Structures are given as C-alpha cells and as structure tokens.
Amino acid sequence: MSKAKVTNARRKRSVRLKLRRSGGGRPRLSVFRSSKHIYAQVIDDLKGETLASASSLEKSMRDGGKTGADIDAAKAVGKLLAERAAEKGVKEVVFDRGSYLYHGRVKALADAARESGLSF
C-alpha cells in the first residue's frame, strides 16, 4: 500500500473514532464520493445499522440523464437523504466527511441536507 493510501486510511479511522466519541449518541451522516457518483447514509453506531441512505445511482436520480459527479447531483442526494431521515424520526446527526475536504460536492450535499431539515 502506498504511503498516501496509508495516511488516508489513518485519517478516516481517526475522524470516525472522534465522531463516535463526541457524537453523544447521535447518528452519523457518512459521505462517500467516487469519481462518478456520490453516496450518503445515516448510520446509528450504537445499534450498528443504517437508518437512511441515498445515492446518485438511484433510479429517480438517473432519470434526468445527468451524471452523478456534479454539485447538482450532490444537492439532490442531500435533499433526498434528509427527507428519508426525517421519515425515520432523525433530526440531528454528526457529519462524517471521512477524508474528503469540506468543499465542492461534499459541501453541497451537507448544505442541501441542512436546508431540508437535518441539523449538524
């Protein structure tokens, strides 16, 4: 494994451990970003289960024929995730950006989730 991958993996693990400790029992909104799509899920770490999830791969997102690798797709995923989390009764979460910078698609997803009712 290259030095960059090792450093990235350590950072991810460190961030997640800090979030679990300081989360106060709140679910975690985890973001994964690939070059073509973006995925997000709300995870209850105490029970070890996913409460809600959304991605740019879903059929409702792909109908427009757009790519999942842009800011508009990230906003749509954030809005959809917040709606699904609200259906499950989740209002407050801890944002887990992993090793990604809070910029671009990650920021757009977070802002859309906030506007749709999630607080973090």
Swiss-Prot record:
Position of the signal peptide: none
Gene Ontology molecular function: any one: structural constituent of ribosome
Matching CDD domains: Ribosomal_L18_L5e
Biased composition (Basic residues): 8-23
Keyword line: Ribonucleoprotein, Ribosomal protein, RNA-binding, rRNA-binding
GO CC terms in record: cytosolic large ribosomal subunit
Record-linked InterPro entries: Ribosomal_uL18_bac-type (IPR004389), Ribosomal_uL18_bac/euk (IPR005484)
Gene3D superfamilies per the UniProt record, alphabetical: 3.30.420.100
Subunit structure, interactors included: Part of the 50S ribosomal subunit; part of the 5S rRNA/L5/L18/L25 subcomplex. Contacts the 5S and 23S rRNAs.
Physiological role: This is one of the proteins that bind and probably mediate the attachment of the 5S RNA into the large ribosomal subunit, where it forms part of the central protuberance.
Similarity-based family: Belongs to the universal ribosomal protein uL18 family.
Protein name per Swiss-Prot or TrEMBL: Large ribosomal subunit protein uL18
Species assigned in the record: Bradyrhizobium diazoefficiens (strain JCM 10833 / BCRC 13528 / IAM 13628 / NBRC 14792 / USDA 110)
